[in-house]
Amino acid sequence: MDWLLFRNICLLILFMVVLGVNSEFIVEVKELDIENGTTTWQTVRRQKREWIKFAAACREGEDNSKRNPIARIRSDCEVSQRITYRISGAGIDRPPYGVFTINPRTGEINITSVVDREITPLFLIHCRALNSRGEDLERPLELRVKVMDVNDNPPVFTQNVYTANIEENSDANALVVKLSATDADEDNHLNSKIAYKIISQEPAGAPMFMVNRYTGEVRTMSNFLDREQHSMYNLLVRGSDRDGATDGLSSECDCRIKILDVNDNFPILEKTSYSASIEENCLSSELIRLQAIDLDEEGTDNWLAQYSILSGNDGNWFEIQTDPKTNEGILKVVKMLDYEQEPNIYLSIGVRNQAEFHHSVASQFQMHSTPVRIQVVNVREGPTFSPSSMTFSLRGGMRGASLMNYVLGTYTAIDMDTGNPATNVRYVIGHDAGSWLKVDSRTGEIQFSREFDMKSKYITDGIYAAQILAIDDGSGRTATGTICIEIPDANDYCPVIYAESRSVCTHASSVRIYVNDHSFGSPFTFCVVDESPDIANIWDIRSINGTSAILMTEQTLSPGPYQIPILVKDSHNRACELPQTVLLDACFCDDHHVCLHSSTTGIYTGDITWVTDDMYGTVTDDGVRQSNVGLGPAGIGMIILGLLLLLLSPLLLLMCCCKRRQPEGLGTRFAPVPEGGEGVMQPWRIEGAHPEDRDVSNICVPMTASNTQDRIDSSEIYTNTYAGGGTVEGGVSGVELNTGVGTATGMVAAGATGTLRKRSSTIGTLREYQDTGMNMAFLDSYFSEKAYAYADEDEGRPANDCLLIYDHEGAGSPVGSIGCCSWIVDDLDESYIETLDPKFRTLAEICLDTEIEPFPSHQACIPISTDLPLLGPNYFVNESSGMTLSEAEFQAEMAAASEPMIHGDIIVTETYTTSDPCVQPTTIVFDSQIPPNVVVTETVMAPVYDVQGNICVPAEIANTHNVYYAERVVASPGIPDMGNSNISDACIGPVMSGGILVGPEIQVTQMMSPDIHISQTTGSTSPMTSQHRVTRYSNMHYSRQ
């Protein structure tokens, strides 16, 4: 029974689904056909219970009731039952109320009033279909009623009056102001699209501004705006909607534009010349006014003038200032003029503005000068002091009557009219703070009236100041002068001269004086005080050092006493108050310049040293000292004793050295230095460990039989010569000359012999190494002979910088299709470029546009097969080659390294130009098991001579197709034999002429060297020395005979 219930339920659900799918909500919209004048109903069916959105529209401001009903809604459920339709939303149950109504039975929607789009641009009506129980039979439907816009709103400007400023002479298209207007009509509609237009301009004339039709931006039309012509413009701007159409609405606004002033006008003076007069010795705060004319706006820096005196004011008598109210220049006299010096003064006045000129006229400005003549009027002048102040100095040490009688000096006035000393004047002391001075009323002599204190408060920095007045008896004019008196400082520790009396000869007299320095004021300055003309003319004093001087005279003195006043000043320019007197007694002298009647036993004249003892001798006038000293017996004995001690001193030293060492006592034993210490001198006479003996005498190479297998004897001798070396970070910096001679014999297949000769020079930094025990005498002799041999060879060698001509340059390939072998290029190994000579490597770098790293010097071992079975027929290959070598030698001077050098070698490669004998045909044995028609491409570093045997490849690649076999030979300390029984079955087969192969394609590329059979150490005794061979590559093609 359960399945029956389930079946019934499923059938019921299926029935409901079918019923729901087939139901529909129909909306009918009534539209008016304007062209035909008919009204039609359009039915919109909603399938699958989906409501269609209502798209009806109404025009604002119109009576739309003639279009009722504007819409009709209907549900397909009304077929089976009674449905009531209801609507809600704005215009129905929300403001504005009562706009729309609906027939609940038929679903017709009517509009009942006029609508305004600016208030409600869109009405949303919610429609419902209800059954008798008030239940929704459908989901509510939302209808949108759009209100169509009409042009019922004019544009409105944001401001009624716009105010803007712009500078005169502005560039064209300069923005002045931007106008803005709004329209309440629908956005992005023609009814709200506003167009701007200038209706009028005041003052009238040429249009100066323009307005953008769409943006409302007001801009200048040209750069002719001039504030001096019109300082204000009024514009009437209109804004019209509907893009300025005639049927559009519009409004207007005012735009007031003020033209701002710029400094584009040059100021000029009102007159072309000016003149004025002034009495001499007078000042004036306003001698003359100069009016400047400027067309710029008054009261601004563009209008305010700036005056300057261009010329004529050499004495700085005048100044000129600007009156900011009137813009006049006021010429002032700031320094008294003198008619006698300048009766007429001619000035040049220039004017400009305080503000910088506008860039449009700045380059046109030139300052013009206006002449101004100033006439100086002569007047009766009184006395004057010239200079206005005078300085007097007071000698130190003056006291009492000497101070009262001392005349400081004379300070008189002059008559300004004549320039001579004034006559009808009297002098009086003016300002005198200490009342110390007095002046003669007629002569102007100034003296002290009383004594004063050196440390008085009226003395400032050693200067006492007072004033003196000169009064004209006739006019009563008064002139004032300033007196400055230098008061010397009181020195409590003044330098004192030794005052003992001294005797001098009457002719060519001189004496040395000394100063007692109590205050450490040296060095001292000496001078003879000019108390009388005789003293100053006769005596002269010269300083010897800081504390002494020599007093001399060149005249002949009269016998008698002399008093010479000398003033001594210390390093601070301080001296005693009174000059010091040196007492001298002039007397007649004998031939030895000794005073005849003086109590002094001896005196030196003509020299700077004065001595009061006669044991030292005398000095003549020509400066030759005549000694009065005699050698007594005691002196002679001391000299003999000194000589004896000097002779006995070596014997005394010898006795001290031969004395036996005491068994005990401090310093009698020495600690022995242990053997092997750093300070021990070794018997091998070099630093470091004991040298190792080596046998290097085997320089002969035994011959090897043709059938001998795996036997290669070698020997090699190298010598190293270093020069100019210095230790740098554990290495030796200098020049290395490596010379090596090696011989080797060996057997390869049918046999081959060769000789290796090497020479290389290395300049650079070499590592430090331990010297070995070699027979240096033998090596020196050997390499000396080799050096001479090389020198002879170099002399006989042709120049290597010219074109070499050979007898046979070769011929073209007999095979015409040799150019077709370009396909081999792709398979060639280009690594040989890395081992090119530096000159060729530079060319390769230029061609390849890349930098080629030098090929590393590594050690390689090349096997040599010496005993291979003959497994097949013999093939003969004719090969010939030539080898061209060149040699370049140079000598480099040693230079000190500017900075530590890294370890490394600089290799100088030597090449030679020789010719070898003709190469005989060689026999190469190939394995018969390998099929014929095999191409062998061989890259040869240098021709191989007298080589017979098989050229073999490793056994593991013997049966491999497309094999590329490269073989490189690099100098190495040990090269084993090339023979190997393991690869005997991988020998190369015959070669066909023309380069065309049949059968297995085995391509073998081999690089060979002339020393390929040498099995020996090719290095040098220096661990940092490396040899490089720079050879050329050549291609050798084998052909079958």
Swiss-Prot record:
PROSITE patterns: CADHERIN_1, CADHERIN_2. Desmoglein repeat repeats lie at residues 884-910, 911-941. Strongly expressed in the skin; during the anagen stage of hair follicles in the matrix, precortex and inner rooth sheath. The chain crosses the membrane at residues 635-655. Pfam families: CADH_Y-type_LIR (PF01049), Cadherin (PF00028). Glycans are attached at residues 110, 545. One of its GO terms (molecular function) is calcium ion binding. A component of desmosome cell-cell junctions which are required for positive regulation of cellular adhesion. Coordinates the transition from proliferation to differentiation in hair follicle keratinocytes. Plays a role in moderating lymphocyte migration to inflamed skin and maintaining homeostasis of the epidermal inflammatory response. It is a single-pass type I membrane protein. The keyword DNA-binding does not apply. It is linked to Defects in Dsg4 are the cause of an autosomal recessive phenotype lanceolate hair (lah). Lah mouse pups develop only a few short hairs on the head and neck which form a lance head at the tip and disappear within a few month. They have thickened skin and do not exhibit any growth retardation. It comes from Mus musculus (Mouse). Its main location: membrane. Keywords: Calcium, Cell adhesion, Cell junction, Cell membrane, Cleavage on pair of basic residues, Disease variant, Glycoprotein, Membrane, Metal-binding, Repeat, Signal, Transmembrane, Transmembrane helix. Residues 1-23 form the signal peptide. This is Desmoglein-4. Residues 50-634 are extracellular. It is found in: Cell membrane; Cell junction, Desmosome. Residues 656-1041 are cytoplasmic. One of its GO terms (biological process) is keratinocyte differentiation. Residues 50-157, 158-269, 270-385, 389-497 form the Cadherin domain. Interacts with JUP. SMART domains: CA. Residues 1014-1041 are annotated as: Disordered.
